[in-house]
């Protein structure tokens, strides 16, 4: 066959494909031959498997495809399949009347490219040429790089010449793909050979701990532990990792135990510690900023070293800060109308730190604590028998002011218009008689003797009509408003006063014609215990609170400090006694109408 014939046959492929048909049944062999010829294939037939094998061995390049029956007397079709596949490397199609999957599987595993059932159809035979093309492609992949060519003629030579141009590149690519497949297989094998992960169960951990205890914590090594445990499939690396985790666990446990021991030892030092008192056996230094039981609850300071202005909350007892307790007692017997000069007192820091150190503290109440209980006992029978008085009283002893039972800052508070106290009937007659005789005997009689504890010189105030913690009010008032005594405007406008005769002046006084008492003046009886009126509302903590008058106005805002009031009051003249300006409204008593 010339080259031109080879090229022509290549262009007409699969026409002229060479097929070898083998079957012991003559009828089936004739039908198969006719069908193959109808498909324009070149057919060679034989009824013996051994003869077919000889034909193939004589010229292996003479045929392109082999069709063989499975059941043959001289040789099994599967045996022929193996020999052809090993010697000639040709595609073989198995033909059988058995459709059992076992036969099909056996044929495929032995190298058959297809499995056809009898009777064979022409449609199946028309597509058998694809097996030839596939086998040639496989041959090209398996050929060497030197370009060896197989000897042959016909269509096979034409097919080889068609693929000579890209043979080198295909070989390199196929070799690269084969190398990748081999590497992938090696990786799969290595993954399959990986050791399984060790799970430390309770029993395994117990063996580990027993081995560590037997060797000792310091001498426990992974190799020795592994030998003592004697567990299958347990490596030294597994034991070393678990030993490291075990040591970290023991270190953490020991740290927690040491911390608990330190805390247990230090509990004794904190047993005597209070949240606000600190350590009981150690005094708190001055300026520590910590409150404790011995110090006052709060010390306030006035600006510029004075007691503060009357109508400003910047002095002592700022609103909502602190207020004096109800029923505070005086320490000595002093007349009600007599004022003493208030000077700056030395600070006492013996009982604790002051939260406002370095600032002027004109009032200090710590010095009044010593005689507090004594003054209570002495004045228990002479205390006021009521809730409180309408106006506050003032008293001093040396450098101290007023003793508060709970060491709160004492403030001078302005009170709303309150109801005047009622006097008991069994004592008011004695006092009216005493005061009437005293006034009628002289125009300016001497004041009652000091340190007098007689019952005639004592006020007893009955409880108010409404016993409740609300601010006291004047219930019975006339059209004219009432102002507390010692008004700043009154004291500044009054002439000098003889301080030897202490009297109390009121702007609003009214006496009946039958009392024989000089209007505008009365003698303040000496007393041992007087109570200051405390505001029921703790937020009413002014120096002298802004007292709203019934007429709709307020007190003078620039009346001056308390020091100015005290000094001006001491200079008032005794002759200025007529301070008419309103009726206090003592409706219950016709013989005496005055303010206290």
From Swiss-Prot:
It is found in: Nucleus. Keywords: Activator, Cytokinin signaling pathway, DNA-binding, Nucleus, Phosphoprotein, Transcription, Transcription regulation, Two-component regulatory system. The modification 4-aspartylphosphate is found at residue 69. Signal peptide: none annotated. Its main location: nucleus. GO terms for cellular component: nucleus. GO terms for biological process: callus formation; cellular response to cytokinin stimulus; cytokinin-activated signaling pathway; maintenance of shoot apical meristem identity; primary root development; regulation of anthocyanin metabolic process; regulation of chlorophyll biosynthetic process; regulation of cytokinin-activated signaling pathway. This is Two-component response regulator ARR12. The lineage of its organism: Eukaryota, Viridiplantae, Streptophyta, Embryophyta, Tracheophyta.
């Amino acid at each position: 066959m010339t080259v031109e014939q080879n090229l022509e046959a290549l262009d007409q492929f699969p026409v002229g494909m060479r097929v070898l048909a083998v079957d012991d049944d003559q009828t089936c062999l004739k039908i198969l031959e006719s069908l193959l010829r109808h498909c324009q294939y070149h057919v060679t037939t034989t009824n013996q498997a051994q003869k077919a094998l000889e034909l193939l061995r004589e010229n292996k390049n003479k045929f392109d495809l082999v069709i063989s029956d499975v059941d043959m007397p001289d040789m099994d079709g599967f045996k022929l399949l193996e020999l052809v596949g090993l010697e000639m490397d040709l595609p073989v199609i198995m033909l059988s009347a058995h459709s059992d999957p076992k036969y099909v599987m056996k044929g495929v595993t032995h190298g058959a490219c297809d499995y056809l059932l009898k009777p064979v159809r022409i449609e199946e035979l028309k597509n058998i040429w694809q097996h030839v093309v596939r086998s040639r492609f496989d041959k090209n992949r398996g050929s060497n790089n030197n370009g060896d060519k197989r000897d042959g003629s016909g269509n096979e030579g034409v097919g080889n010449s068609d693929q000579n141009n890209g043979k080198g590149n295909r070989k390199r690519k196929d070799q690269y793909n084969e190398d990748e497949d081999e590497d992938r297989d090696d990786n799969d094998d290595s993954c399959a050979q990986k050791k399984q992960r060790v799970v430390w169960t309770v029993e395994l951990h117990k063996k580990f701990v027993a081995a560590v205890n037997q060797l000792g914590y310091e001498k426990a090594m992974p190799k020795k532990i592994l030998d003592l445990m004697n567990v299958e499939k347990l490596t030294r690396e597994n034991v070393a990792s678990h030993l490291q985790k075990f040591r970290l666990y023991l270190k953490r446990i020991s740290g927690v135990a040491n911390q608990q021991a330190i805390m247990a030892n230090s509990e004794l030092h904190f047993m005597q510690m209070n949240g606000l008192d600190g350590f009981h056996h150690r005094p708190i230094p001055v300026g520590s900023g910590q409150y404790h039981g011995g110090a006052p609850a709060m010390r306030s300071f006035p600006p510029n070293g004075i007691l503060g202005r009357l109508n400003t909350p910047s002095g002592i007892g700022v609103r909502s800060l602190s207020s004096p307790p109800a029923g505070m007692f005086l320490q000595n017997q002093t007349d009600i109308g007599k004022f003493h000069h208030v000077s700056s007192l030395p600070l006492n820091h013996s009982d604790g730190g002051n939260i406002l150190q370095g600032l002027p503290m004109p009032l200090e109440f710590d010095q009044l604590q010593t005689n507090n209980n004594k003054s209570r006992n002495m004045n228990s029978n002479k205390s006021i028998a009521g809730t409180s008085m309408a106006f506050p009283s003032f008293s001093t002893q040396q450098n101290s002011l007023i003793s508060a039972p709970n060491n709160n800052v004492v403030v001078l508070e302005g009170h709303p218009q309150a109801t005047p106290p009622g006097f008991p009937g069994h004592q008011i007659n004695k006092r009216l008689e005493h005061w009437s005789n005293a006034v009628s005997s002289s125009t300016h009689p001497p004041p009652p003797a000091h340190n007098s504890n007689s019952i005639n010189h004592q006020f007893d105030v009955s409880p108010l009509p409404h016993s409740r913690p609300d601010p006291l009010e004047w219930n019975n008032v006339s059209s004219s408003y009432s102002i507390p005594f010692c008004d700043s405007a009154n004291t500044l406008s009054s002439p000098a006063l003889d301080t030897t005769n202490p009297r109390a002046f009121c702007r609003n006084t009214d006496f009946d014609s039958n009392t024989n008492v000089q209007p505008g003046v009365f003698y303040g009886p000496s007393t041992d215990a007087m109570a200051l009126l405390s505001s029921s509302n703790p937020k009413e903590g002014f120096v002298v609170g802004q007292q709203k008058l019934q007429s709709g106005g307020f007190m003078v805002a620039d009346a001056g400090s308390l020091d100015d009031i005290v000094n001006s009051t001491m200079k008032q003249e005794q002759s200025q006694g007529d301070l008419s300006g309103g009726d206090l409204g003592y409706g219950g008593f016709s013989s005496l109408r005055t303010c206290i």
